[in-house]
Amino acid sequence: MRILFSADHHIKLGQDKVPKEWQKRRFLMLGERLNDIFHNHNCDLHIAGGDILDVADPSSEEIELLEQFMSRLDHPGKIFTGNHEMLTKTISCLYHYAGVINKVTSGKWEVITKPYRSPEFDIVPYDEIHKAKWKPPVSKLCFTHVRGEIPPHVKPEIDLTKYNCYDTVIAGDLHSYTNSQTIGSTRLLYPGSPLTTSFHRERTKGTNGCFIIDTDTLKVEWIELGDLPQLIRKTIGAGEEMEPSDYDRVVYEVTGDVVQLKSIKDSDLLDKKINHRVTKDAKLNLVDLDMLGELELYFREVEKLSQGDIDRILARAAKYVKDYN
């Protein structure tokens, strides 16, 4: 049997700086891509390994998008829960949408609601991994949803040696293919989220994808999906143009001094303004200086203006100082 495995889709609408219509198009594009991969690689089954939804209480609009996404998958599939779909320690919101998912896929997709064991593969869903005792294994291949280790800060959420009864474990949770690891002689492989779920400084490579697994040989092929639309955050200087992208969602951090940033108009492309001129407490010797002298010293030592700019400002200020005096 040949299995397509994807996980951590994280269907979500309303994310800051991410237009809903762009996000919808991106997920439907992903659905069509996964469907093409399934058929082009002669797969027999597609398994979605948890966190297809971003939250356990999705909005009606997000459920509508889930239905549209699933309807693109015109092939047999099984879907099991991840941590993001858990309403309680034992109940997943996917259990409530099992009928909807089955209906919009014309009966081709099934939501796994309990531990699954078979000669071809086992499924240990998220609501099973924290149990003291698991249902005995049947296969040497396991599909699951579990947080592994990312040294030095991210620790496994359970004792991963519980998977040592398997030769190969295909998992959702960690969002990068590079997080694949071993547990003794057991392979713990992550395909990565098929879409970027947060903004990156540049397009990701070698991170986002899906797997094709042969259940007879346990051969695993990773397919990169980094060419799909991504979330990009760029940094530019004040005065540089914020260029929109027709494909990716690109937002901009704009750097400059206080005066420059004040002139930046709000835009849906603007992420934030960054004052790059961070100074220590100013210590200027203002003894025996009149008001114009104080201004000249401030513009030269703090604002670092050219002498020409300072002279023009002082000339304009002089008449106001005269009136003030």
Swiss-Prot record:
A single GO BP term for this record reads: symbiont-mediated suppression of host gene expression
User: What does its record list under induction?
Assistant: Expressed in the early phase of the viral replicative cycle.
What InterPro entries does the entry give? Calcineurin-like_PHP_ApaH, DNA_Repair-Maintenance_Comp, Metallo-depent_PP-like
Signal peptide boundaries: none
* Key words of the record: Bacterial host gene expression shutoff by virus, Degradation of host chromosome by virus, DNA damage, DNA repair, Early protein, Exonuclease, Host gene expression shutoff by virus, Host-virus interaction, Hydrolase, Nuclease
What does the function comment of this entry state? Possible exonuclease involved in phage DNA recombination, replication, and repair.
What subunit structure does UniProt give?
A: Could consist of two subunits: D13 and D12.
Q: What is this protein called?
A: Probable exonuclease subunit 1
In which organism is this protein found? Escherichia phage T5 (Enterobacteria phage T5)
